[in-house]
Design a protein with these regions (language model features):
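Hydrophobic alpha-helical packing residues
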Residues: 38-41, 154, 194, 323
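Conserved S-adenosyl-L-methionine
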Residues: 115-232, 237-239, 244, 251-253, ...
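Short amphipathic alpha-helical segments, especially helix-boundary/capping motifs
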Residues: 53-59, 74-78, 101-106, 167-173, ...
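A conserved structural/catalytic subdomain of Rossmann-like adenosyl-cofactor enzymes
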Residues: 210, 221-433
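Homeobox/homeodomain signature
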Residues: 20-23, 53, 66, 108-109, ...
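Non-catalytic, mostly N-terminal accessory regions of nucleic-acid modification and defense proteins
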Residues: 1-136, 209-216, 307-310, 332-340, ...
């Protein structure tokens, strides 16, 4: 529709190709057009699209969720002219734009605004993908999509040929675009960010559904809903209502524990997962945590646990681990790696790919080192009937024991003795004077 084309309303040009200031809408005229005509028109794409898996439908969804936040038509006019100067038709230009978008998402996380929801450090995501090694033809799912960082990084990994550097055929590219990536997101802003992020990375019609993932009863998930790979970082510390908990066999208000049950169910038999979760999952003694650890270890092979350092997630303020598991076979042994970059992480010193290089290399053969060790499931706190805590919070046996903390009384006595010694020395100095 010509009226709504960028070249008609946002950046009209003269016959010489110069910006046409005489015909460009501005001020109240521009605001009336954008709010009263343009947004409703774009919102209508959802109704006019042939199917939900088209980019037209996704555009309609985006404009159903957002509102124009710019209140001045003159400020909007200035912004439009700046945008018109941008060029993003080539792949290189699109890549630059997607990188800029990622930086903005990262800044949201670093500022502590929705950091746990929107931004998982990309080096950590890439390491998780390197361990799982997805292949063309497999489906990849994230039921807590946030900004869709996992799916965008997985797309880049596969687009570049994956672990085997495969040259992709036309059929492979079609599969990658249409039948590989699936996601769900509850929050409106995160949902819009996810769709835009995927489009900018090159996934033209993202399979992202705007829904509360935990509102789905686990019993309703059929084999046709399941996926080969799950990559996710569910929200930290959320609480769910009683009616939502009824959808799960292990009932708990802890959102991350409900998500973990969902992810296990969403995996095909033999499917692989890498899930970020709070490190307290390994040791919590409440009934739900114990039951969930038992469920995971008895029905999945939890082959790897990556222990992340403090401030890996800059906006979240919690310590995390990454659980790597395969569905359908019980755990016999779990390999742990204690990630220690040798420095304190922070905004100016974030996690990088080099920090995770050793983990990726050692994980291939589950090798022991100063930072890695293995734990046999038979060594866990359980009996022959499966009763016990199933506590996985083992300490690194390859590190020297820290000196035990002294008793407060002993410290006080030493301070008193040192004070007396200092007093005696000062007395001798005074005598000399």
């Amino acid at each position: 529709d010509e009226k709504y084309r960028w070249s008609s309303w946002a950046a009209p040009k003269t016959v010489d190709g110069e910006f046409d200031h005489d015909n460009a809408l501005t001020g109240s005229d521009l605001m009336e057009f954008v709010d009263g005509e343009l947004f409703p028109y774009l919102k209508g794409f959802k109704l006019r699209a042939k199917s939900p898996d088209t980019i037209e439908y996704k555009i309609g969804e985006i404009f159903s969720e957002i509102k124009n936040k710019i209140q001045s038509g003159y400020s909007l006019r200035d912004a439009l002219e700046k945008v018109d100067e941008l060029r993003f038709r080539s792949q290189e230009e699109k890549h630059e734009l997607s990188h800029l978008y990622e930086v903005k998402i990262k800044n949201m996380g670093n500022a502590g605004r929705n950091g746990g929801e929107y931004y998982t450090p990309r080096p950590l995501i890439r390491a998780m993908i390197d361990v799982l090694q997805p292949q063309i033809g497999e489906t990849i799912y994230d039921g807590a999509a946030g900004s869709a960082g996992f799916l965008c990084e997985a797309y880049d990994y596969l687009r570049q040929g994956g672990a085997s550097n495969k040259q992709l055929s036309t059929s492979d590219l079609k599969t990658l675009q249409e039948h590989t990536f699936y996601a769900k997101e509850k929050k409106s802003l995160a949902y819009v960010i996810a769709i835009m992020n995927m489009i900018l990375h090159g996934i033209e019609a993202p399979n992202v559904i705007h829904t509360n993932t935990l509102g789905e009863n686990l019993q309703d998930i059929t084999p046709s809903n399941q996926h080969d790979i799950v990559l996710a970082n569910p929200p930290f510390g959320g609480k769910e209502r009683k009616e939502v908990q009824q959808n799960f066999p292990i009932k708990t208000g802890e959102t991350a524990f409900l998500f973990l049950q969902h992810f296990i169910k969403m995996l095909k038999p033999g499917g692989r997962a890498a899930i970020v979760i709070k490190n307290t999952f390994l040791s919590n003694t409440d009934n739900a945590a114990i039951a969930l650890r038992k469920e995971l270890l008895e029905n999945c092979n939890l082959h790897t646990v990556l222990d992340c350092p403090a401030k890996t997630f800059l906006g979240a303020g919690v310590k995390t681990v990454v659980l790597f598991f395969t569905k359908g076979e019980p755990t016999q042994k779990t390999w742990f790696y204690q990630l220690d970059p040798g420095r304190s992480l922070g905004k100016t010193n974030p996690l990088n790919d080099k920090d995770l290089k050793e983990f990726i290399e050692l994980q291939k053969g589950f090798e022991e080192s100063a930072k890695s060790w293995s734990l046999a499931i038979t060594d866990l706190d359980t009996d022959s009937k499966g009763n016990g805590t199933w506590d996985l919070s083992v300490k690194n046996p390859n590190q020297a024991e820290e000196a035990p903390l002294r008793e407060p009384q002993a410290i006080i006595e030493e301070i008193i003795a040192l004070d007396k010694e200092s007093e005696a020395i000062l007395g001798k100095i005074q005598e000399l004077l």
